[in-house]
């Protein structure tokens, strides 16, 4: 019995020495691009302008750049918007250009900000829009929903009429 115990002990000690411990590394954050948030505004803008102005860019890369730009908590500068619209036109993606303008409008936030910031951006890029033949969502009729009629007795608060500009519509009575 003693020899059996000695054999098991010897195997356990030998096995412990034979097993190599696995070196672990510290987990790295999946957000490697978060450093871009700390860039100065000019460097940030130039990164996207240079990326979107590449002549060999394809549709997937344009979508990737616009998606990445949308992920950051910024409203793009008109220079970046111009580069994005030109890239959309270069790959012949009219719908992406309109959706990009709509995303900028949504990122502007409340109606007050949309009236000032979004209007400023559209005014600045208007020559490029005309040159490329791209319409804004408002020109296409996407400024407000097609079949939306608020029903205040169900869920619509009366103060929202004024916030969203429905107090000026002739068919809606408060």
From Swiss-Prot:
One GO CC annotation: respiratory chain complex IV
Localization (cell): Mitochondrion inner membrane
Keyword Ribonucleoprotein listed: no
Keyword Transit peptide: yes
Keywords per UniProt: Heme, Iron, Membrane, Metal-binding, Mitochondrion, Mitochondrion inner membrane, Transit peptide
Subunit structure: Component of the cytochrome c oxidase (complex IV, CIV), a multisubunit enzyme composed of a catalytic core of 3 subunits and several supernumerary subunits. The complex exists as a monomer or a dimer and forms supercomplexes (SCs) in the inner mitochondrial membrane with ubiquinol-cytochrome c oxidoreductase (cytochrome b-c1 complex, complex III, CIII).
A Pfam match: COX5A
Domain of life: Eukaryota
Pathway stated in the Swiss-Prot or TrEMBL entry: Energy metabolism; oxidative phosphorylation
GO biological process, one term: mitochondrial electron transport, cytochrome c to oxygen
Molecular function terms, GO-annotated: metal ion binding
Family, similarity comment: Belongs to the cytochrome c oxidase subunit 5A family.
InterPro entries assigned: Cyt_c_oxidase_su5A/6, Cyt_c_oxidase_su5A/6_sf
Topology with respect to the bilayer: Peripheral membrane protein
Function: Component of the cytochrome c oxidase, the last enzyme in the mitochondrial electron transport chain which drives oxidative phosphorylation. The respiratory chain contains 3 multisubunit complexes succinate dehydrogenase (complex II, CII), ubiquinol-cytochrome c oxidoreductase (cytochrome b-c1 complex, complex III, CIII) and cytochrome c oxidase (complex IV, CIV), that cooperate to transfer electrons derived from NADH and succinate to molecular oxygen, creating an electrochemical gradient over the inner membrane that drives transmembrane transport and the ATP synthase.
Entry protein name: Cytochrome c oxidase subunit 5A, mitochondrial
Transit peptide: 1-29
């Amino acid at each position: 019995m003693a020899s059996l115990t000695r054999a098991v002990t010897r195997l356990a000690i030998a096995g412990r020495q034979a097993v190599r411990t696995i070196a672990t590394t510290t987990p790295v954050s999946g957000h490697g691009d978060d450093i871009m948030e700390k860039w100065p505004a000019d460097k940030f803008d130039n990164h996207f302008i240079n990326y979107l102005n590449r002549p060999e860019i394809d549709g997937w890369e344009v979508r990737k750049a616009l998606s990445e730009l949308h992920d950051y908590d910024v409203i793009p500068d008109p220079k970046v918007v111009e580069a994005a619209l030109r890239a959309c036109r270069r790959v012949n993606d009219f719908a992406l250009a309109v959706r990009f303008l709509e995303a900028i409008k949504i990122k502007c936030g409340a109606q007050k900000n949309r009236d000032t910031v979004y209007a400023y951006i559209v005014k600045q890029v208007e020559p490029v829009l005309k040159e490329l033949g791209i319409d804004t969502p408002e020109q296409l009729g996407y400024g407000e929903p097609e079949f939306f009629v608020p029903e205040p007795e169900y869920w619509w608060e009366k103060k929202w009429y004024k916030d969203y500009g429905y107090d000026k519509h002739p068919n809606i009575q408060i």
